[in-house]
C-alpha cells in the first residue's frame, strides 16, 4: 500500500515514527508525501499540552475526510493521544480503523493489514514494555543528524505532567542495542547523534543499578562516522561528576546540555513536584561553567503555573537575568486532565501567562543577542544544513545549536558546500538568536 505518515510532537515521538516507517517499508509498503495518493494514512500523535492535543485532533479530523471520500482505505492513529483516549478516538471518529498505544508501534504492519481487511484493530501493550527495534529505521531528518532514544518512560511524576501515565516507568534501552542502532544510523549518513529520552541523565539506573550515561557516551564516541554527540533532556539534579568528566575528555561530545529547570522560585518548584531548589540550580550551573568553560546551556521554563504570584515571576526574571542561559524556551502552563496541578488553587489567567512569557522572552532576546555579539571574530565549526534559496549563502549549526529549537549560522559564501559536511566559519555578525559568518581562510579539515 501507499502510506502517508504524519509524525506530530517531540523528537522522541519522531524516533518512534522512524521505527514504524522501517517496519512498513521492510514489509513492502511505499511511503508517499501527499494525502491524495495515499491508500493509508498513519498519524503518530502528541497530547503533552493543550496545543499539541488540538493539533492531533485537527489532523485526525482532516485526514478522516480522505477516508470519507474513499481515497484512503485505512486510517491509523498511534502515540500519546491514542494511549490516552483509546476508546474516545474510535467512538467519536468512526473513520479511524486502528489505534495503537505508545508501546505497541511494533504492531503497525499488523494494524495496517487488519484495517485493509476492513477490521477495527486496537493494540495496547503494557506501558512498561520496551518495544523492539525495527532493525531498519528510516531517518527522516535529512540524514545528517538523527535522534537516538536511550530510554522510555519517567519516574519523576511532576505535578503538571501526564507523561508517566502514557509512557510508563523509566526503563533504559540496553547498551548493546543502542550501539547497534548508532552504527546503523552512521551507515545511513548520520553525522550528529542526538540522545533523547524523557530524562537522559538517569540512564542505566534500572539496568545496572547506577547511572551509566557516561559509559554509554564513551562507547558511542567509538562509532565510526559519528562526528558530534549531543545530549538533551538532562534533569539538573541528576548531573554527576563522571558525566562532566567524559564531556571534557571526549572530543565528539558537544559542550552543550539541555537542562529543563521549569522555574526558579522554591515555592513554585515544590508545587511542581520538582526535586531541586534555586540554590541547587545555581550550584549546578556554576559547576558546569567552571568545569567546561565553553559549555552552551539550554533550558525551558513554565510560566503561569497555579499559584504563581508576581513575586514568583519577578524571582524567575531575576534568575534568568543572573544565570544568562545561552538558549531558553518558555511554555505557558497548560492544565492537563488527571494531573495534580489541574485542580490546584490559584489558576493564572491565560492573558497573564502570556504576558509573563513575553517578558521572559524579551529579556532572553537581549541576553542571546549579547552572547551572539561576543562571538564576533571567533572561528566555529559549523555543520551545513542546506543552501539559502536564491542567495550565495548556507544555513548551518554550531555545537551550541540543537536542531529545530535553537538558532542557525548563516554562512555567506560563493563556495559549494554539501549538506552534512563541516566547515570552519568566522563569525561576522549576530542577530537575536542567529549568527552570521563567512568561511574561514582554511575552512575545510
Which role fits each region the language model picked out?
Residues 1-203, 242, 253, 257, ...:
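Proteins enriched for Cys/Gly/acidic motifs involved in redox and nucleic-acid/cofactor modification
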Residues 10, 204-221, 225, 271-275, ...:
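Radical SAM enzyme [4Fe-4S]-AdoMet core and its adjacent flexible, acidic
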Residues 74-76, 84, 89, 187-311, ...:
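Conserved SAM/AdoMet-binding glycine-rich loop
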Residues 93-94, 115-118, 211-213, 247-248, ...:
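Short, hinge-like loop/turn segments at secondary-structure boundaries
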Residues 178, 195, 231, 259, ...:
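Conserved, mostly hydrophobic/aromatic
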Residues 197, 233, 261-263, 299-303, ...:
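Active-site proximal loops enriched in glycine and acidic residues that flank catalytic Cys/His/Asp
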Residues 243-244, 316, 411-413:
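Short beta-alpha junctions and helix-cap segments that line functional grooves
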Residues 343-445:
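Terminal RNA-binding accessory module
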Amino acid at each position: 500500500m501507499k502510506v502517508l505518515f504524519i509524525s506530530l510532537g517531540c523528537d522522541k515521538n519522531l524516533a518512534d515514527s522512524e521505527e514504524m516507517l522501517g517496519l512498513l517499508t521492510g514489509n513492502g509498503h511505499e511511503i508517499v508525501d501527499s494525502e491524495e495518493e495515499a491508500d493509508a494514512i498513519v498519524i503518530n500523535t502528541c497530547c503533552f499540552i493543550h496545543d499539541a492535543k488540538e493539533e492531533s485532533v485537527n489532523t485526525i479530523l482532516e485526514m478522516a475526510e480522505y477516508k470519507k471520500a474513499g481515497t484512503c482505505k485505512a486510517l491509523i492513529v498511534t502515540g500519546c493521544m491514542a494511549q490516552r483516549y483509546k476508546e474516545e478516538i474510535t467512538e467519536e471518529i468512526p473513520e479511524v480503523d486502528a489505534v495503537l498505544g505508545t508501546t505497541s508501534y511494533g504492531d503497525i504492519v499488523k494494524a495496517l493489514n487488519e484495517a485493509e481487511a476492513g477490521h477495527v484493530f486496537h493494540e495496547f501493550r503494557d506501558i512498561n514494555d520496551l518495544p523492539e527495534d525495527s532493525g531498519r529505521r528510516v531517518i527522516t531528518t535529512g540524514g545528517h543528524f538523527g535522534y537516538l532514544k536511550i530510554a522510555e518512560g519517567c519516574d519523576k511524576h511532576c505535578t503538571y505532567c501526564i507523561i508517566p501515565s502514557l509512557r510508563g516507568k523509566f526503563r533504559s534501552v540496553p547498551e548493546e542495542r543502542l550501539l547497534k542502532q548508532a552504527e546503523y544510523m552512521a551507515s545511513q549518513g548520520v553525522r550528529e547523534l542526538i540522545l533523547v529520552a524523557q530524562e537522559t541523565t538517569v540512564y542505566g539506573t534500572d539496568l545496572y543499578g547506577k547511572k551509566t550515561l557516561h559509559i554509554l557516551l564513551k562507547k558511542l564516541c567509538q562509532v565510526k562516522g559519528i562526528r558530534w554527540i549531543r545530549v538533551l533532556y538532562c534533569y539538573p539534579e541528576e548531573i554527576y561528576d563522571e558525566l562532566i568528566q567524559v564531556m571534557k575528555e571526549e572530543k565528539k561530545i558537544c559542550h552543550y546540555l539541555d537542562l529543563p529547570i521549569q522555574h526558579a522560585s522554591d515555592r513554585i518548584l515544590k508545587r511542581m513536584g520538582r526535586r531541586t531548589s534555586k540554590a541547587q540550580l545555581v550550584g549546578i550551573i556554576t559547576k558546569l561553567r567552571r568545569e567546561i568553560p565553553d559549555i552552551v546551556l539550554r533550558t525551558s521554563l513554565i510560566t503561569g503555573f497555579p499559584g504563581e504570584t508576581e513575586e514568583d515571576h519577578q524571582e524567575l526574571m531575576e534568575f534568568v537575568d543572573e544565570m544568562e542561559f545561552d538558549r531558553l524556551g518558555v511554555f505557558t502552563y497548560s492544565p492537563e486532565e488527571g494531573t495534580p496541578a489541574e485542580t490546584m488553587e490559584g489558576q493564572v489567567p491565560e492573558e497573564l501567562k502570556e504576558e509573563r512569557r513575553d517578558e521572559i522572552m524579551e529579556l532572553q532576546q537581549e541576553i542571546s543577542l549579547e552572547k551572539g555579539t561576543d562571538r564576533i571574530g571567533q572561528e566555529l565549526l559549523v555543520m551545513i544544513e542546506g543552501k539559502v534559496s536564491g542567495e550565495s549563502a548556507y544555513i548551518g549549526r554550531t555545537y551550541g545549536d540543537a536542531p529545530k529549537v535553537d538558532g542557525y549560522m548563516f554562512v555567506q559564501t560563493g563556495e559549494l558546500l554539501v549538506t552534512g559536511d563541516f566547515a570552519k566559519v568566522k563569525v561576522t555578525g549576530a542577530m537575536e538568536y542567529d549568527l552570521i559568518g563567512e568561511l574561514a581562510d582554511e575552512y575545510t579539515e
